[in-house]
Amino acid sequence: MADVVVATKAPIILMHMRGTPKNMQQNCEYKDVVQEVAVYLAQRAQLLRERGVSADKIILDPGICFAKNVEQNLLLMRDLKALTSFGYPVLLAASRKSTLGAVLGGVPAEQRLEGTIATSLQAIYAGAQMVRVHDVEENVRAIRTLEAILRGSVE
């Protein structure tokens, strides 16, 4: 994969996951989920760098709901700065995920907009550059509002 990224200059998203989609939820044992995910992604990014992939082509994704339970997902979102501190762009993809369903009392996926917006705002506040969402307009408006608050200006 590194050879393709080098040759095409395409970006690559490194997502944390243990196991396969069929068995990943049986692989949720961590001593410190934030530290372990951060180390895993940092090591994978370093391997790509050693293979010639430019740092600006590497994007880190903690893999929300991939081999993690609800509490672990919440810890990763809370402590997302552990990933943004590496200097690579970070992507958070938590839109409508089951963790939000658990937090919001079991509402179905299509009723998790508020939870998705909250995760998007937390991600941007923690330094993530990207969020993957289903409800783009609503998330963009919320993020623009957060950015104005952080700047203390509409401009």
Language model feature labels by segment:
Residues 55-57:
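Short acidic capping loops at alpha-helix termini that bridge into adjacent secondary structure
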Residues 64:
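Active-site metal-binding loops of divalent metal-dependent hydrolases
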